[in-house]
Amino acid sequence: DNFKKLYNDSDVTKRNRNGQTSSGLYSLFIPMEWNYEGFIDSFGLPVFDTPGTPVEGPHGDKIDVGVVEHWENEADGLKDDPDGLNEFYRQFPRTEEHAFRDETKNSIFNLQKIYEQIDYNDGVLTSGAVTKGNFKWENGIKDSRVIFMPDLNGRFNISWIPSLNLQNHVITKNGGKYPGNEHIGAFGCDSYDISGTTDGRGSKGALHGLTVFSMEDAPINSFFLEYIARPQTAEIFFEDVLMALVFYGMPLLAENNKPRLLYYLKRRGYRGYSMNRPDRTRNKLSTAEKEIGGIPNTSEDIKQIHAAAIESYIDKFVGLQEDGSYGNIYFNATLNDWSKFNINNRTKHDAAISSGLAIMACNRHLYQPKHLRQTKVLDFGFKKYNNEGSISKIIK
């Protein structure tokens, strides 16, 4: 992570007025096809594409396959070995994303689909799919309207903005505020309670928004918002979350073992935006759960449900689809976090925790407890008679 940060801080296209990058260095990435042994012609030039006629190499050998096709054939041969495919990408990278992939062993998710989506996101077609920015209260007046302001240094990544009639859809009931677009989607959040840590490396806050099928003008089963940041204070993070909820008009499922965010929402009058845990009926909730909502994400059964939710989403909606299209999650940070997710050590996986809660929130009907209806035969003590013949007889 430190080397990747150094590399990103050395982007030559992002220099200050003195002509310096943030690190004072210039980054350089050379894709593997530019210098792959066995695919250089006699003039020292790479043979990128398969030639119509064989090309002579520097030692007189014939080159009849382009390096790109050779690379794709090797990758295709590893499609049933996700760990091997990941290692192949790391050793022979064609993109910066390939070069910075971590070593991944025994991933519990479908790495092939995750990598298909990452490679697709790196393509030209998705370059404008994500906008960075921040949410602001209109004219600085809290609890009014929320607006989105594009900003290259913003904390939010978004791929969909609802139409004006869907923005800031707040319903007021019994003096409380409730989301007006809960039929369109929901949010998941991995919060934190402490503003700072002694080493400055505390986990980040994460927020993800996901849509479901609806009749509204909105994408279907699409992650439309990604927020992975740790502002200077926890209150800034809480306000960021609140503004996103209000702007999209959707409810939130958050961890309640770190409850400051949920108390913040309640104090501001937005308790109606905090979902109760979907796996229990209201009369089974604890006192704190009734007060602020949320779900404890520490028990083993919740961990398994959470991981299964992500796994199901990846299998259905990530990577290459049966119709030849690709999934519409354009956030590579989240995809990379899924690829590295360790269910036994989830502390560093803020994006995976948050996105999994969003999936659970959108599929909350799957976790609702089922009530078994039992029928009981009641004996009212009525006498029964046999009316055959001229005289009826009591049935004993």
Q: What are the residue ranges of the model-derived segments?
A:
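RNase H-like, metal-dependent nuclease domains and their acidic two-metal-ion catalytic environment used
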Residues: 1, 5, 19-24, 36-277, ...
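Short alpha-helix plus adjacent loop in nuclease-associated cores
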Residues: 274-319
